[in-house]
Amino acid sequence: MFSRTDSISKRILLPLVLFLLLAGLAPAALAQTKTFHWTQWDIDVVLQPDGRLAVTETQTLDFSGAPFTFGYRSIPVGRAGNNDGISNVSVREGDQIFTESSSNAPGTFEVVDQGDETRINWYFDPALGERTYTFSYIIDGAVCVGTS
């Protein structure tokens, strides 16, 4: 038969063992937390004679934790962006030019109209550490052109 101290010991021991087991797994779970930050973000804007803006963004991101396989860039358009939208989108990583496709395959990107913003989703091989991506696009109707 069990004594009263055996029963109390089991009630304390089981939760203690579960707590220690979960506490031991926590560092592994934290190590897999996906985070990123920009280490550099350069933007080159050239005003075209027709009032459009030719934009080139070069973004260096530092991925940590579990590998990343996609990213996105949202650009306000219409009234929210005070423009007529974007066009001529291209994405590259170094010399690799991404292909426009909705396949979500590495090396592709898609342009998605979401009303007040246009979202550029781009897909790449699993990435950790620093990676640099270049986005080029035209902002239509950014500047009103007229004669005086």
What does each model-identified segment do?
Residues 1-9:
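N-terminal secretory signal peptides that target proteins for export/translocation
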Residues 7, 13-14, 76:
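Sequence-pattern detector for short linear motifs
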Residues 9-10, 22, 71:
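Residue-level detector of alpha-helical hydrophobic segments embedded in or interacting with membranes
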Residues 15-24:
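Bacterial N-terminal signal peptides
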Residues 27-148:
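Lumenal/extracellular ectodomains and adaptor appendage modules
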